[in-house]
From Swiss-Prot:
It catalyses: N-acetyl-D-glucosamine + ATP = N-acetyl-D-glucosamine 6-phosphate + ADP + H(+). This is N-acetyl-D-glucosamine kinase. Keywords: ATP-binding, Carbohydrate metabolism, Kinase, Metal-binding, Nucleotide-binding, Transferase, Zinc. It comes from Shigella sonnei (strain Ss046). The lineage of its organism: Bacteria, Pseudomonadati, Pseudomonadota, Gammaproteobacteria, Enterobacterales. Pfam families: ROK (PF00480). GO terms for molecular function: ATP binding; N-acetylglucosamine kinase activity; zinc ion binding. Zn(2+) binds at residues 157, 177, 179, 184. InterPro entries: ATPase_NBD (IPR043129), N-acetyl-D-glucosamine_kinase (IPR023505), ROK (IPR000600), ROK_cs (IPR049874).
C-alpha cells in the first residue's frame, strides 16, 4: 500500500492508495504548531493506524510546502513551524523503519495528475498552479524533476517576457514580488494578479470570482479583461514551453475552475512558440483536494 501525506499549516492529511492507485482510506488530524515531537508523533500514529488497518508496512511519501531537504538535511517550511529547520525525512525514516520520501506540494500536485489513468500516456507533464500564487512541477516518466534546490517548476518567479511588456504597454507597472525580484509573473497571473489587473485598468476593486461572474453574464468590460489575461498567460506559458516542451499541461488552483482558462488557451499559444513546436494538450486538474495525498503516495510508484 502507498501512504501519502499532504501536510500544511493547519492539517495533516493521510491517504492510503492500493496498487491500482485507488484511494482506500483517509484521515486528517490538526498540524501541531509548536512541538516537533508532537508533530512526529502525529505522523507516526497515522502510519501505525494504517499499517494495522491494512495489515502491511506501507510506503510513506510526504508533500509539504517549502524545501523538503536543504543542504544540511533539514526541512524549510515556513507554514509548518514545528518541523521547519528539523531533519524530518531522516527522523521519520528512523522512527518508521522505512524509506520516507519528501517533496514539495506543487510537485505532488503535478505527480498526482501525471498518474491519472488517461494522462499516463504522456512522458513529460507540466503541472501549472494558478491560485493564490503561481507554481507547479514537472514530471518525466512518472517521476518529479526536483533540481538540487527543489525549485524546478517555480514558474511564478520567472519575470515578464519582453513580448508581454509590448502587449501590455511599455509603461506597464513592474511590481515587486515577495521573493524580492521585480516583474515576477505570479503578480499578474495568480488569482490575486487577475484581480490586480482589473483594478489597474478599470480602477475598481473586485476579486476574481466577482470578475468571472460578470464575464459569465456577458459584461463587455469583464470579457475584455479575460481576453487580456489569457493573452498574457499565453505569452508567459509560451516562453516556458519553449524550454520545457511538455506533452501535457494540467492546470490547477482556483483559476482552473474558470473554463475559459483551459478551453481558450491552446489557440493562443502557437504565435508564442517556435514554428516547429506542437501545442501540448491542456487540461484542468482532475483530482482536486486529494491531489496532494495522491502525489505524495506516488513518490514510490516507480520503484
Amino acid at each position: 500500500m502507498y501512504y501519502g501525506f499532504d501536510i500544511g499549516g493547519t492539517k495533516i492529511a493521510l491517504g492510503v492508495f492500493d496498487s491500482g492507485r485507488q484511494l482506500q482510506w483517509e484521515k486528517r488530524v490538526p498540524t501541531p504548531r509548536d512541538s516537533y515531537d508532537a508533530f512526529l508523533d502525529a505522523v507516526c500514529e497515522l502510519v501505525a493506524e494504517a499499517d494495522q488497518r491494512f495489515g502491511c508496512k506501507g510506503s510513506v511519501g510526504i508533500g509539504i510546502p517549502g524545501m523538503p531537504e536543504t543542504e544540511d538535511g533539514t526541512l524549510y517550511a515556513a507554514n509548518v513551524p514545528a518541523a521547519s529547520g528539523k531533519p524530518l525525512r531522516a527522523d521519520l525514516s528512523a522512527r518508521l523503519d522505512r524509506d520516507v520520501r519528501l517533496d514539495n506540494d506543487a510537485n505532488c500536485f503535478a505527480l498526482s495528475e501525471a498518474w491519472d489513468d488517461e494522462f499516463t500516456q504522456y512522458p513529460l507533464v507540466m503541472g501549472l498552479i494558478l491560485g493564490t500564487g503561481v507554481g507547479g512541477g514537472l514530471i518525466f516518466n512518472g517521476k518529479p524533476i526536483t533540481g538540487k534546490s527543489y525549485i524546478t517548476g517555480e514558474f511564478g518567479h520567472m519575470r515578464l517576457p519582453v513580448d508581454a511588456l509590448t502587449m501590455m504597454g511599455l509603461d506597464f507597472p513592474l511590481r515587486r514580488c515577495g521573493c524580492g525580484q521585480i516583474g515576477c509573473i505570479e503578480n499578474y497571473l495568480s488569482g490575486r494578479g487577475f484581480a490586480w489587473l482589473w483594478q489597474h485598468y478599470y480602477h475598481q476593486p473586485l476579486q476574481a470570482p466577482e470578475i468571472i461572474a460578470l464575464y459569465d453574464q456577458g459584461d463587455e468590460q469583464a470579457r475584455a479583461h479575460v481576453e487580456r489575461y489569457l493573452d498574457l498567460l499565453a505569452v508567459c506559458l509560451g516562453n516556458i514551453l519553449t524550454i520545457v516542451d511538455s506533452d501535457l499541461v494540467v492546470i490547477g488552483g482556483g483559476l482552473s475552475n474558470f473554463p475559459a482558462i483551459t478551453t481558450q488557451l491552446a489557440d493562443r499559444l502557437p504565435r508564442h512558440l517556435l514554428p516547429v513546436a506542437r501545442v501540448p494538450r491542456i487540461e484542468r486538474a482532475r483530482h482536486g483536494d486529494a491531489g496532494g495525498m495522491r502525489g505524495a503516495a506516488f513518490l514510490h510508484l516507480t520503484d
